[in-house]
Amino acid sequence: MSNLTPSIAVIGAGSWGTSLAILLAGKGYPVRLWGHNKEHIDRLISDGENSRYLPGISLPESLYPTPSLEKAVLGAQLVLMVVPSHVFRTVFRDLIPFLPIDCQIVSAVKGIENSTLSTMHMVMAQELAAYPALALIELGVISGPSFAKEVAQKQPTAVTVGFASADTAKKVQDIFSTDYFRVYTSTDIDGLEISGAFKNVMAIAAGISDGLSYGSNARAALITRGLAEMQRLGAAMNADPATFAGLSGLGDLLLTCTGDLSRNRNVGLQLGKGHSIEHIESEMFMVAEGVKTTKSFYDLARKLDVETPILDEVYHIIYEGKDCSQAVQDLLGRKLKPE
């Protein structure tokens, strides 16, 4: 990455993408924010804010919304991927022809691709493998407990940036860090992605518990045993165990399972109150990654032969229509064992 002020492309103009674009542009970086919906992008330009996702928060002068992937990506030293996991590969594949040969790309997406069970870092690596001329591009992730609205409001937040190279992680850490947005570094990309995605499933479980009007004891048990499932999956994928006690693991798990801004917890709340997943999704205008990620992790756990009882019950509720109260009883009725 050049020592000059880097040009940054943020791919995805939802709440999280816009929030990160505001943060980076607020530091004086020239930021181009891409969205697939031209009408939405035109509205960002005319309103000077993302009134759909972050109303009342102004876009800095150095933030330039665009519906053109080419205009967004050409010349960017840092590319930030912030689109839903189910369209991630398609969007990434479309922007590859415009990538500079030595840029850094960071995924800010917490999900697992359904069809391949790949993390977003894996998806990027798979797609770039067909382009030897882009072999110098470095891939990383950013993860941690970070509601978009609070980041856009400049409320104190801490996250972790991960790259295979500690030096590159440090460079990207410096780009993102502010007096309200503290960034740590890691080289455990797999651990960051597994924990960041899996916590969304546990947030649905916690929401179901709350929707059934269970108390704090039940929520604490779900979070703790959910962390154990996360750790078992991480071990099967050779992740660093310490990552799961960090910001992307326990930190994000606590936030998403308890915070009122959590879309995944809200899905669980509505399920617990008896609403169908079809009804819940029809009422949402923002993506809850945990719904699709539940299926990905369910399939992955079967593939890796990892025991994930809470994940399994969330899957049965969402994809098989199992009664939520029965799922809880089945969890509590499992064979007793040591912790």
UniProtKB/Swiss-Prot annotation:
Its EC number is 1.1.1.94. GO terms for biological process: carbohydrate metabolic process; glycerol-3-phosphate biosynthetic process; glycerol-3-phosphate catabolic process; glycerophospholipid metabolic process; phospholipid biosynthetic process. It is found in: Cytoplasm. One of its GO terms (cellular component) is cytosol. Keywords: Cytoplasm, Lipid biosynthesis, Lipid metabolism, NAD, NADP, Nucleotide-binding, Oxidoreductase, Phospholipid biosynthesis, Phospholipid metabolism. Pathway: Membrane lipid metabolism; glycerophospholipid metabolism. Its main location: cytoplasm. The active site is at 199 (proton acceptor). The keyword RNA-binding does not apply. One of its GO terms (molecular function) is glycerol-3-phosphate dehydrogenase [NAD(P)+] activity. Pfam families: NAD_Gly3P_dh_C, NAD_Gly3P_dh_N. PROSITE patterns: NAD_G3PDH. NADPH binds at residues 15-16, 36, 110, 148, 263, 287, 289. InterPro entries: 6-PGluconate_DH-like_C_sf, 6PGD_dom2, G3P_DH_NAD-dep, G3P_DH_NAD-dep_C, G3P_DH_NAD-dep_N, NAD(P)-bd_dom_sf. It catalyses: sn-glycerol 3-phosphate + NAD(+) = dihydroxyacetone phosphate + NADH + H(+); sn-glycerol 3-phosphate + NADP(+) = dihydroxyacetone phosphate + NADPH + H(+). The keyword Phosphoprotein does not apply. Sn-glycerol 3-phosphate binds at residues 110, 144, 146, 199, 252, 262-264. HAMAP family: NAD_Glyc3P_dehydrog. Belongs to the NAD-dependent glycerol-3-phosphate dehydrogenase family. Catalyzes the reduction of the glycolytic intermediate dihydroxyacetone phosphate (DHAP) to sn-glycerol 3-phosphate (G3P), the key precursor for phospholipid synthesis. PANTHER family: GLYCEROL-3-PHOSPHATE DEHYDROGENASE, GLYCEROL-3-PHOSPHATE DEHYDROGENASE [NAD(+)] 2, CHLOROPLASTIC. This is Glycerol-3-phosphate dehydrogenase [NAD(P)+]. It comes from Desulfotalea psychrophila (strain LSv54 / DSM 12343). The gene is gpsA.
